[in-house]
């Protein structure tokens, strides 16, 4: 990609932002930077928190550039989870987050649309009744099985870790397949992740609080994107 193409891509990705969305991004990143200064958090934690925050805000906007920041987040978050011995989180990064960045990019690339302002955003879909039934049954079965596997492996916080890992898998799959219901799972996941990291890591705690706010907005915005497709 030459300089002009890169410049055009960045300009395209930054177009169509509402004032609230800009404030949301500034607030989320600012919270991470403030925490870094106050607590002298490890640099890797800070990089993970900041890139992860930028990534999810871009996802809520339906911007394909989220995958660049998601890739950086995945690499750094793996080592943060490794330090805390969260086996489930490590596996979710290694087998879900990392592959999803590459798969998701190409699936999204083939399914983009332009809004009235000419800004390019992803084409969003919604689950039907059958899709919901498959999702709920799969979540229940795989969560129970994975919790038992974590206990056998000697992981920390196995029940909570197991729930968050399987929920992450499902939400990530819905994300790369462009379903708006991913955001309902992200809301649940972010609440659970706040509990998981509450005592262990302030940087991760702040990151997931920012994620929770963004996921609520993400569901709202993707509902609008999905209605645009129906229209």
Where are these regions (language model features)?
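Alpha-helical transmembrane segments
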Residues: 18-31, 48, 137-140
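Membrane-helix interface "capping/anchor" motifs
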Residues: 57-69, 173-185
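Short, Lys/Arg-rich, polar N-terminal cytosolic tail immediately upstream
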Residues: 1-15
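Helix-coil boundary and interhelical linker segments in multi-pass alpha-helical membrane proteins
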Residues: 38-40, 79-90, 149-157, 198-203
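Hydrophobic/aromatic-rich structural module bridging two neighboring secondary-structure elements via a short loop
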Residues: 59-107
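C-terminal transmembrane-bundle signature of multipass membrane proteins
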Residues: 175-231
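Membrane-proximal helix-loop-helix units in multi-pass membrane proteins
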Residues: 92, 96-164
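Short, hydrophobic transmembrane alpha-helix segments
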Residues: 31-43, 60-62
């Amino acid at each position: 990609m030459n300089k002009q193409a890169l410049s055009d891509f960045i300009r395209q990705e930054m177009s169509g932002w509402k004032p609230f969305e800009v404030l949301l991004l500034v607030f989320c990143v600012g919270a991470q930077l403030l925490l870094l200064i106050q607590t002298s958090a490890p640099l890797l934690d800070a990089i993970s928190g900041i890139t992860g925050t930028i990534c999810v805000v871009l996802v809520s906007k339906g911007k394909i550039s989220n995958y660049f920041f998601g890739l950086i987040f995945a690499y750094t978050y793996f080592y943060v989870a490794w330090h805390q011995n969260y086996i489930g989180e490590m596996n979710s990064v290694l087998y879900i987050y990392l592959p999803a960045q590459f798969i998701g990019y190409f699936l999204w690339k083939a399914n983009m649309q332009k809004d009235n302002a000419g800004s390019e955003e992803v084409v969003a879909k919604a689950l039907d009744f059958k899709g919901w039934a498959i999702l709920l049954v799969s979540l229940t079965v795989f969560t129970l099985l994975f919790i038992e596997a974590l206990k056998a492996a000697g992981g920390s916080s196995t029940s909570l870790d197991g729930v968050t890992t399987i929920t992450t898998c499902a939400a990530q799959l819905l994300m790369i397949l462009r379903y708006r219901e991913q955001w309902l799972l992200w809301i649940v996941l972010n609440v659970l992740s706040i509990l998981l990291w509450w005592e262990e890591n302030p940087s991760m705690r702040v990151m997931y609080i920012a994620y929770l706010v963004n996921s609520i907005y993400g569901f709202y915005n993707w509902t609008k994107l999905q209605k645009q497709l129906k229209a």
